[in-house]
């Protein structure tokens, strides 16, 4: 039996971060939390980097990530690819 998990601190709003998941009431995308986490930052260290967030918001973002890992990973990979393309185009100017 599967139970649907609610994420009290996560929302998707058209016009904010392209409708991607963000911390509710902020413009901070879930993927930003995930990137810090991948870099080895603990939730407490992430809070120091992003002091406008509380630990519950950060933990919920990580929980959301693990519930929707493929979606967030694709978003991060797509962003990385776009940045690389932009840097390559700029290097030829």
Predicted regions and their residues:
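A generic structural signal for short, solvent-exposed coil/turn residues
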Residues: 2-4, 15, 47
């Amino acid at each position: 039996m599967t139970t649907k998990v609610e994420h009290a601190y996560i929302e998707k709003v058209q016009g904010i971060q392209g409708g991607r998941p963000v911390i509710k009431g902020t413009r901070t995308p879930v993927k930003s939390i995930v990137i810090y986490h991948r870099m080895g930052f603990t939730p407490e260290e992430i809070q120091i980097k992003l002091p406008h967030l509380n630990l519950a918001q950060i933990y919920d973002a990580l929980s959301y990530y693990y519930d929707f890992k493929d979606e967030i990973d694709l978003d991060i990979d797509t962003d990385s690819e776009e940045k690389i393309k932009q840097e390559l185009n700029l290097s030829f100017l």
